[in-house]
């Protein structure tokens, strides 16, 4: 075969090589030419030379066959092409009946080992692997190549195709060919070959030749060669011509993969190797190796698209996740319709699931009265169950109970369980999802396990149909509990729910059957569900069970959504490229408030979450409830009220039960407006907010549609359940779970009204709001706020606590637990944002963090709480969870976001503090609403984080690790808190306590590199004369700079794990910015203990920062919001600092320890005037935390940092460069402050200067 000739390459090419060879200027060319056979030969000669024009004729020096062989053997390019390659190819082709291209590929892959090649061909290389490629690029080069191929046959084709091509072709001679192409191409047809002149198989030889290199690259890329970078491909590349030869044109490169050898049979190969083929090949070979998309970062997006990202779901981020997490996809996003049940699949398992659920309920209720009796013990829906982190079933009943309990405790489900515990039936139904038939705990346990096995995330974004049902059932049951009479189905059910194990459960089973199918419907959110909720008939009519199941099934993809909800890190740095979710991006906003990072203040992610979750989850969970409520709007309204009960879970449920009667009444009333809302609910706050009214309407509408979650509001109480639900998380936002939870509680406490209001209002609001801007929600929120504030408060105490939580917020522990909102895992936790941290588990819910406490709609917040709560178990939380969990990172905000949004505002309304708590994303919403003061920025930061500056605590102080929950990224960074480099500010060497005279700046630190040099730039001479004569002159000298002149560590210090700001999206420098002190006069900004107080310790008190705190608010940091966040709140934080009596730290300490100091203008003398003096380096000034040095003081002080900007480091260092803290005098700084104010802007104090 020509091939042989080719393989003969130079050798075979002998004669032809002469022709072509000359042209080729190499045996390779010759070989190709030869291969080309005479016909091609001449052409090859010309073409092959690539230089052929130039060298073609030069037959004078044709390498002898021996020379060629030697060249081939020694030529690395020919690489595996040993002279006998052609023979091997021929042999393989005969033995394996594979095309030359495939054979070449196999040989290439197998390093020319025939045996391995045979095996490779037979076992590995798919038949026709290269066949498809043929036509792709046949066009230009291929045409030529083909032409050649036709002429010369496979190999020949190449040769003739291009001068270079011919060379390239050289079968055996690939090396030479390539070389020739290189040489000859360069020389002779360098233009062609090298250039990729058309000669080269028409494909520009250059391309090909270059191609050779290119091929090599391609190989490197793994596209083509996937294997040898150059080897095969290179050869091919070098062959380029060869590969190109037949494949020429596209073939060659196209053929990148196997075909590298592909040149062979160029003609055929051409046909075979189309670029398309190349992909295909790549598919084959690369398949193993890389994806064709290997180069692109985009693939993430693309996959997302491939996954049928829905615009609605379309957070690129989210879908991308879906794509990457294919293995985890339970459904296809394409099918995702509403955000209805994310876990639909679980639910969807059988259209009969509803029936099964019914059975399961019946059996469970009947069979497992104990579990039923256990309000908390609802079987979580599969998704939720999986969320429940601990699903081990101890016993049948216990299993269910435990799971239920576990689920309840650890999951949003827990909330539902608690709230909806009434309906063991509900529980069962969920299990029924799992396999409705089994009342048996074991089965339930199995189901749980299954659920657990299921991707946990799914539940989180949206409730699966199952979950939706579950929560809906819970809420409806609760609702039923309250308004048992309202709906037949519910009525029956409530007893079941109320009396978890009541015989009525029997009825409940029927009801549940009714409901349950509806619940699936609820997932759909069609009225059917509601109808079903309304009565069995409705359920039947809804045919919701099947439909809902279908919907659920369809929705199952939404489960996927959930996944998306908490996108796993994509393999492609989707987030790096674009921070996941906007929350992260928000962080990227570079809100300088280091401490007050806006981890998700961004609403966009919220929107996603809202859309996804609110729509999906909300829809699934809330909507389910809502729809039950709405659809069954009539009596179901009662359900609507009821739903909150689930949230409170037991308590609230009970409370609600107590208050339900009232609410019931309102509910009916609400039904018209919003099934979910009780009229009382609506009345108090909702009336307050027209939004509520609208929401009521909207609830009916939007709730029923997307924001069922919103509707969940009342539903939300259920929403809490929803919250319990993963989806509910958002719902909760919408629902304003707190209301849901608290609300439900409130309802109990307050009366239906609060519960409803929050739930309704917020929920309603939320429903529309989250997706929307949340502002309405927030208006709603505001109104919610009122509600919260008004009626709610009683019930909201938790929230109050939350507020306190705000303070707490920083302290994750925060009573938040108190909040029932947390019903699930948070149950214990107050809603306080803290709660979320503390309760990451479930439902901890931002609610907690956000204001769950706020209790306002904070469910929304709660949602965030959820996020915070991040109880993974409850996916709803899950979302939150995501937030909470760092892993959930983006979600944090996200979760928070939607909910946050609501939350925030709600929070804000509820309390300012809350605001900060909710602070998250909501901030914007919050801003929009109440408190916006809070503050967006407040929002930005999760208040709950004890974000004290995690950075420098004190010079010697190791980073005090705070558990503050930053966003995921923050976490990444934060974790590294350690004394990063020596405490970052700490000097790595122990500095002498006194540097020469009282820490004269000039004091040399022998160990420190430049310490000896006096700072000529900033001579201290000023200092001595400086007005601050009060300070000991030595100090005064030092005053300005206040420390040996040590180079500060970089503000952005990447070492020591700390990666301060720059590591963060927001580039706040590690040094906390000093707030401009101008605003804060002397001590005001950062109060420091007296300079020489003997360490902050003595400064027993940092002031509460009363002023300071306020200053914070006032100061530039406002944006930081930290201040907004409330330094008031902060004051509490200060308490944390526990520095001592707050008052000790009177501004006087700072400010004017020395009259002169205050007067002194350090601009010049303290070289740091513009820039704060180096942060006290550890040894400097007061080398020690105890030292008078403010920094040291910071130790105690730091905790104060509740404010999000890290005041400690920056401020003290800046102000108190030296212990004397001359500089710190705020006045002085105040003066300079104007300059310095830039700091906040610049982020790095030096920047401004």
Swiss-Prot record:
Q: What is this protein called?
A: Protein lingerer
- Determine if rRNA-binding is one of this entry's keywords: no
A single Gene Ontology biological process assigned to it is: copulation
Keyword annotations from UniProtKB, A to Z: Behavior, Cytoplasm, Phosphoprotein
Pfam families the record matches: UBAP2-Lig
Q: Could you tell me what this protein does?
A: Acts in the nervous system to mediate the control of copulatory organs during courtship.
What are the Gly residues biased-composition ranges?
7-30, 38-50, 186-209, 228-240, 248-269
Where is this chain compositionally biased, Polar residues type?
457-494, 678-705, 738-769, 777-809, 862-873, 1124-1138, 1216-1249
Give the span(s) annotated as Disordered. Answer: 1-66, 132-312, 350-375, 454-506, 549-579, 616-717, 738-922, 1016-1042, 1124-1149, 1164-1186, 1211-1249
What does the UniProt entry say about where the protein is found? Cytoplasm
According to its record, what are the GO cellular component terms? cytoplasm; nucleus
- Using the record for this protein, list the coiled-coil segments as residue ranges, or answer none: none
Spans of biased composition, class Low complexity? 350-369, 549-559, 616-639, 647-664, 706-717, 811-861, 874-884, 892-922, 1023-1034
Q: Which residues form the UBA domain?
A: 84-124
Per the record, where are the segments of Basic and acidic residues compositional bias? 210-227
User: Keyword Aminoacyl-tRNA synthetase on this protein?
Assistant: no
Q: Could you tell me the superkingdom of the organism this chain comes from?
A: Eukaryota
Query: What species is given as this protein's source?
Result: Anopheles gambiae (African malaria mosquito)
Q: Note the PANTHER family from the entry.
A: PROTEIN LINGERER, UBIQUITIN ASSOCIATED PROTEIN 2-LIKE/LINGERER
């Amino acid at each position: 075969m020509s091939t042989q000739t080719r393989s003969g390459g130079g050798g075979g090419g002998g004669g032809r090589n002469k022709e072509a060879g000359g042209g080729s200027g190499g045996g390779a060319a010759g070989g190709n030419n030869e291969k080309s056979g005479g016909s091609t030969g001449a052409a090859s000669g010309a073409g092959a030379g690539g230089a052929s024009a130039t060298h073609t004729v030069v037959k004078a020096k044709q390498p002898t066959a021996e020379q060629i062989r030697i060249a081939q053997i020694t030529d690395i390019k020919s690489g595996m092409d040993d002279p006998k390659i052609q023979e091997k190819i021929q042999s393989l082709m005969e033995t394996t009946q594979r095309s030359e291209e495939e054979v070449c590929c196999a040989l290439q892959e197998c390093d020319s080992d025939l045996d391995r090649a045979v095996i490779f061909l037979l076992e590995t290389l798919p038949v026709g692997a290269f066949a498809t490629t043929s036509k792709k690029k046949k066009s230009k080069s291929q045409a030529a190549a083909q032409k050649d191929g036709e002429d010369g046959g496979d190999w020949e084709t190449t040769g003739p195709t291009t001068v270079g091509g011919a060379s390239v072709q050289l079968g055996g001679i690939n090396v030479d060919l390539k070389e020739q192409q290189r040489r000859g191409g360069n020389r002779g047809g360098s233009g062609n070959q090298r250039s990729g002149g058309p000669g080269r198989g028409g494909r520009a030889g250059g391309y090909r030749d270059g191609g050779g290199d290119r091929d090599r690259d391609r190989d490197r890329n793994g596209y083509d060669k996937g294997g040898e970078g150059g080897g095969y491909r290179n050869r091919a590349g070098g062959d380029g011509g060869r590969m190109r030869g037949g494949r020429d044109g596209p073939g060659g490169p196209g053929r990148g993969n196997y075909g590298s050898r592909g040149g062979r049979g160029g003609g055929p190969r051409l046909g075979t190797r189309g670029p398309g083929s190349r992909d295909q090949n790549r598919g084959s070979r690369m398949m193993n190796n890389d994806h064709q998309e290997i180069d692109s970062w985009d693939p993430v997006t693309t996959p997302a698209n491939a996954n049928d990202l829905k615009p609605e779901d379309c957070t690129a981020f989210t879908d991308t996740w879906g794509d990457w997490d294919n293995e985890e996809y339970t459904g296809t996003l394409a099918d995702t319709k509403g955000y209805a049940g994310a876990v639909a699949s679980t639910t969807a398992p059988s259209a009969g699931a509803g029936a099964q659920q019914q059975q399961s309920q019946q059996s469970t209720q009947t069979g497992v009265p104990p579990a039923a009796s256990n309000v908390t013990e609802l079987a979580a829906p599969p998704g939720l169950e999986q969320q429940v982190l601990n699903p081990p079933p101890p016993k049948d009943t216990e299993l269910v109970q435990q799971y239920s309990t576990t689920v309840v405790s650890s999951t949003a489900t827990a909330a539902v369980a608690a709230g909806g515990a009434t309906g063991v039936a509900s529980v069962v139904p969920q299990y029924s999802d799992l396999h409705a038939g089994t009342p048996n705990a074991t089965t339930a346990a199995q189901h749980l396990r299954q659920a657990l096995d299921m991707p946990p995330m799914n539940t989180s974004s949206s409730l699966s149909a199952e979950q939706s049902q579950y929560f809906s059932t819970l809420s409806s049951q609760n609702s039923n509990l309250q308004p048992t009479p309202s709906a037949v189905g519910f009525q029956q059910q409530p007893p079941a729910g109320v009396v978890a194990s009541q015989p009525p459960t029997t009825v409940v089973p029927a009801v549940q059957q009714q409901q349950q199918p509806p619940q699936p419907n609820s997932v759909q959110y069609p009225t059917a569900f509601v109808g079903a909720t309304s009565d069995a008939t409705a359920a039947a009519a809804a045919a919701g069970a099947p439909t809902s199941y279908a919907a659920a099934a369809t929705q199952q993809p939404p489960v996927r959504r959930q996944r998306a909800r908490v996108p796993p890190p994509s393999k492609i740095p989707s987030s790096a490229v674009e921070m996941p979710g906007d929350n992260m991006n928000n962080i990227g906003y570079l809100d300088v408030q280091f401490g007050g990072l806006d981890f998700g203040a961004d609403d966009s992610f919220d929107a996603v979450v809202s859309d996804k979750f609110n729509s999906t989850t909300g829809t699934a969970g809330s909507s389910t409830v809502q729809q039950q409520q709405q659809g069954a709007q009539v009596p179901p309204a009662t359900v609507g009220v009821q739903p909150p009960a689930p949230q409170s879970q037991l308590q609230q449920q009970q409370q609600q039960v107590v208050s339900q009667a009232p609410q019931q009444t309102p509910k009916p009333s609400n039904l018209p407006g919003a099934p979910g809302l009780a009229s009382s609910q609506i009345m108090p706050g909702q009336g307050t907010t027209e939004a509520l009214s609208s929401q009521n309407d909207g609830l009916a509408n939007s709730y029923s549609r997307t924001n069922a979650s919103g509707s969940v509001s009342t539903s939300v109480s259920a929403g809490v359940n929803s919250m319990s639900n993963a989806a509910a998380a958002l719902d909760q936002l919408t629902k304003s779970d707190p209301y849901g939870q608290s609300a439900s509680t409130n309802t109990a406490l307050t009366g239906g009204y609060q519960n409803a209001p929050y739930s309704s209002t917020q929920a309603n609001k939320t429903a529309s709001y989250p997706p929307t801007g949340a502002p309405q929600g927030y208006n709603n929120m505001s109104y919610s706020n009122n509600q919260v504030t008004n009626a709610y408060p009683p019930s909201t105490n938790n929230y109050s606590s939350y507020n306190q939580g705000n303070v707490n917020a920083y302290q994750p522990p925060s009573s938040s637990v108190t909040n029932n909102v947390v019903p699930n895992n948070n149950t214990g936790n107050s809603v306080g944002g803290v709660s979320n941290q503390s309760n990451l588990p479930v439902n901890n819910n931002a609610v907690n963090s956000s204001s769950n406490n706020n209790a306002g709609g904070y469910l929304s917040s709660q949602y965030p709480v959820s996020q915070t709560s991040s109880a993974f178990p409850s996916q709803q939380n899950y979302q939150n969870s995501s937030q909470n969990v760092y892993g959930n990172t983006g979600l944090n905000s996200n979760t928070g976001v939607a909910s946050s949004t609501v939350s925030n505002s709600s929070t804000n309304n509820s309390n300012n503090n809350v605001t900060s708590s909710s602070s998250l994303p909501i901030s914007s919403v919050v801003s929009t609403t109440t408190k916006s003061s809070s503050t967006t920025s407040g929002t930005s930061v999760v208040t709950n984080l004890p974000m004290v500056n995690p950075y420098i605590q004190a010079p010697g102080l190791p980073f005090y690790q705070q558990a503050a929950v930053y966003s995921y990224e923050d976490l990444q960074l934060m974790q590294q808190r350690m004394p990063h480099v020596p405490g970052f500010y700490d000097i790595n060497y122990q500095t002498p306590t006194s540097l020469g005279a009282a820490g004269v700046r000039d004091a040399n630190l022998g160990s420190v590199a430049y310490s000896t040099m006096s700072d000529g730039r900033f001579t201290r001479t000023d200092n001595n004369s400086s007005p601050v004569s009060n300070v000991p002159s030595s100090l005064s000298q030092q005053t300005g700079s206040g420390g040996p002149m040590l180079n500060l560590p970089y503000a952005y210090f990447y070492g020591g794990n700390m990666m301060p700001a720059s590591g963060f999206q927001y580039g706040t420098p590690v040094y906390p910015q000093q707030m401009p002190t101008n605003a804060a006069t002397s001590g005001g900004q950062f109060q420091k203990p007296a300079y020489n107080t003997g360490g902050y310790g003595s400064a027993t008190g940092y002031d509460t920062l009363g002023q300071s705190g306020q200053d914070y608010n006032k100061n530039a940091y406002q944006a930081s919001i930290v201040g907004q966040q409330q330094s008031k709140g902060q004051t509490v934080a200060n308490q944390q600092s526990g520095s001592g009596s707050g008052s000790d730290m009177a501004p006087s300490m700072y400010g004017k320890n020395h009259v002169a100091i205050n007067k002194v203008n350090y601009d010049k003398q303290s070289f740091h005037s513009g820039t704060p003096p180096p942060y006290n380096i550890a040894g400097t000034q007061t080398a020690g935390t105890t030292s008078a040095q403010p920094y040291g003081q910071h130790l105690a002080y730091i905790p104060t940092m509740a404010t999000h900007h890290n005041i400690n480091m920056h401020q003290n260092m800046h102000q108190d460069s030296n212990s004397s803290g001359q500089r710190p005098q705020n006045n002085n700084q105040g003066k300079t402050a104007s300059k310095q104010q830039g700091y906040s802007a610049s982020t790095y104090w030096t920047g401004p200067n």
